Amino acid sequence: NNGEIQQIDTPYNMFHYPANQFVAGFIGMPGMNFIEVDVIEKDGEIWIKGKNGSFKVNAERANEIRKQAKQNQKAILGIRPEHVVPCENVEDSFFQGTIDVYEMLGYTAILHVQTDDGKIVSSIEENDSYKAGAPINFRLNEDHIHLFDIESGKTICN
């Protein structure tokens, strides 16, 4: 990044455990989704809150976040497209949006979706029931979230 080495590691580790937001966005195709969120501690639990949804972080990740994050701070949530999963119910979802593009690639497909949080990309099994212009809800595979400091871009948790 601007001629400065960001991380020296194996491709596996850079993909799964990026040192910062730059590395996370550089590796992987399609690229990682980035969303501004609030990290909130309430009644001893850590919650991630986006514009239209929130979820409680599991205990292991909550401890990791407590070590690195300031209490009640804004952060950047990173989630790879394969971990953004369509769901039926708005109540179960973190994002709601409208499909811009359905890109079939054989057995897999890429959904490009416009949400209140910006453009989100999801990589799914091909399914011809998805159409451009249709509403869609997504949940996140929470075991695969990344959090980055909003100012420095450094990893808070992988």
Predicted feature residues:
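Internal alpha/beta loop-helix hairpins
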Residues: 1-54
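Non-catalytic connector elements of ABC transporters
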Residues: 30-34, 41-158
